[in-house]
Amino acid sequence: MNEIDYKFVHKDFRINGFPIDRNRLIILAVAYVKDGLPYRKSVGRFLLDWLDDRDYVEATTSGSTGIPKQIKLKKQSMVNSALATGDYLKLSPKNRALLCLPADFIAGKMMIIRSIILGLHLDIIRPSSMPLSLTSKNYDFCAMIPLQASKSLVDLPRVKKVILGGASIDGELEAKLQTISTEVYSSYGMTETISHIAMRKVNHTEVHQNTYKALPNVTFTQDERHCLVIDAPLVADHPVVTNDIVNLISRTEFEWLGRFDNIINSGGFKVFPESVERKIKKYIKGDYFITKEADEELGQRAVL
């Protein structure tokens, strides 16, 4: 991975079609903060944080590793994350990218940093459940949540590569994604790891893939709970202990089973609600969920 300083702005970087260097980026950030549109304000505030003299930005965790809290993310680590994504997805300077997520959260922030560091041509639009309805352009790369993808299936082929994160992809959406030309990836990560550190290819595979593969310079282990422990020295100073129970295939590959917080211990047999819900989805129409209730003999039992 190339060593690139966090003050670097790629010569090919564009925002909404305009060439942007560091000085212009400051001017744009101030203009966005003064703008009346909330999504532009959040972009502007983040850019000002990125361009200040500190070597870190502050962010709020999602709760993947515990109670949500404010943490400091090193700017150099964010650059390293951007380079790893570019390497994994083979993104190139002048590739067209779309920001359709709020810049308040790590996924939106990192779309901006990837564009600055990799020299992408970034379009910024208002976050919406149907983002591609707000633009007629074609793109090489975009990050979405599954809800946005599910409401954009007709237009999604206008994007070559899409990463989905922030929530799991249900079986119905995954089946529909098999028929489109877009390369779709399910991403795994959190604020503490500066967005994703592993990917699962959702479509265009010979056989269905249910395992996540590590990005460059990332390895995995498990703790005594069988929860994933992430060692990603280029983006996190210390190993990140998650509450996600996994089947560890190797030091660079795992299958996600469910959250430790949600385990149902029924007579010593551990039930993972998320896994059960995925398996019965094709048999049940409508909304449902698996939960637990007390049982005199089993201790707990799973309830639909």
Write out the residue ranges for each language-model feature:
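Conserved pre-ATP/AMP-binding loop-to-beta segment of ANL
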Residues: K41-T60, P93-K94
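AMP-binding/adenylate-forming catalytic core of the ANL superfamily
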Residues: N243-L304
